[in-house]
Design a protein with these regions (language model features):
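N-terminal low-complexity, Ser/Thr/acidic repeat segments characteristic of secreted
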Residues: 1-160
């Protein structure tokens, strides 16, 4: 009888250790993601935003049956931080698009530099058309706005 109790105690102890280990791993994963998400800025590629959203969703799915309030609170804080970073990225994209659209004399090199710089600031990559040929600034502007629109659409659809 004493041996049965010792065996039961051993298995209960093992289950407890496994549960503690799982808790620590999940907590570390949330902390790691929080650290990564906090470093996101407007220059970061839009694909990274989508990757982080997918990681958060996986984590959320794995924790849906967990009743630990601390983990759920950390996950909510992580989601909130991500949404704040995403909103900032979308606002920066829309502001850059508006600035590019407001540039009037788009065929001079200063305007082309502004178009290129605004695009670069939000992670859109466009070709700098530096020649004095008329129409190149307009092409740059159209390409920048088109790319920014694609990024906005991708972020709005892919992260909601």
């Amino acid at each position: 009888m004493k041996n049965k109790n010792i065996v039961k105690l051993f298995f209960v102890s093992m289950l407890f250790i496994m549960a503690c280990k799982a808790y620590v791993e999940e907590k570390e994963q949330i902390d790691s993601l929080s650290t990564d998400v906090s470093t996101l800025n407007n220059k970061i590629d839009h694909e990274k935003f989508n990757n982080y959203k997918q990681e958060i969703n996986k984590l959320k799915e794995s924790l849906k049956d967990v009743s630990n309030a601390e983990l759920k609170e950390k996950l909510l804080a992580l989601e909130s931080l991500f949404q704040d970073k995403l909103a900032a990225k979308l606002a920066a994209l829309k502001a850059a698009k508006q600035k590019i659209e407001e540039i009037t004399d788009i065929d001079n090199n200063t305007a082309k530099s502004k178009i290129w710089a605004e695009s670069k600031l939000v992670g859109a990559t466009i070709k700098f058309s530096g020649s004095n040929t008329a129409g190149n600034g307009k092409k740059m502007s159209e390409e920048a706005v088109k790319q920014i629109d694609k990024i906005i659409k991708f972020l709005e659809e892919g992260t909601n």
